[in-house]
Amino acid sequence: MTSPHVHIGEILARNARLYPDSVALVERTPAEKKRSEITWKQFDDQVNRFANVLIHKGIKKEDKVVHLMMNSIDWLIAYFGIIRTGAWAVPLNFRFTGTEIEYCSSVAEPKCFVFSQEFIDRVDGIRNDLPTVKDFIAVGREIPKYAESFEKLLEK
């Protein structure tokens, strides 16, 4: 039985140790007739890589990182990577307008902002109004000039 005081990130690491080659996550994109899956070990490795990226950027315990993405495997990798650093993940609702994103981000005072390509227009409109954000990380094929590619950062 799991202790009631185990961090959720430790559950992921434990599953990677116990079931390294078992499928952890499956993502289906019916419109593209695409199916992706990753094992527990792959999931844990990618979470570690993203956590290390954030740490290298200066993110530390109790910092805040805004997380604005559509549901996907990358959403989970980013979320777990954020919390593995000890920082607070600040997930925002995908339905938020630019004004709502700016308001919530201003209240949170994040140091980093992770978003998927579906939100480029909304982030473009507010990014200059977020003085605490030092790094923007974009997920997907379209990466604006002011952001770094999530995928490329994971490759390093």
What would you call each of these model-derived segments?
Residues M1-S3, R35-S36:
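Acyl-group handling in specialized metabolite and lipid biosynthesis
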Residues L12, H56-K57, R84-K152:
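Structural core segment of the AMP-binding/adenylate-forming
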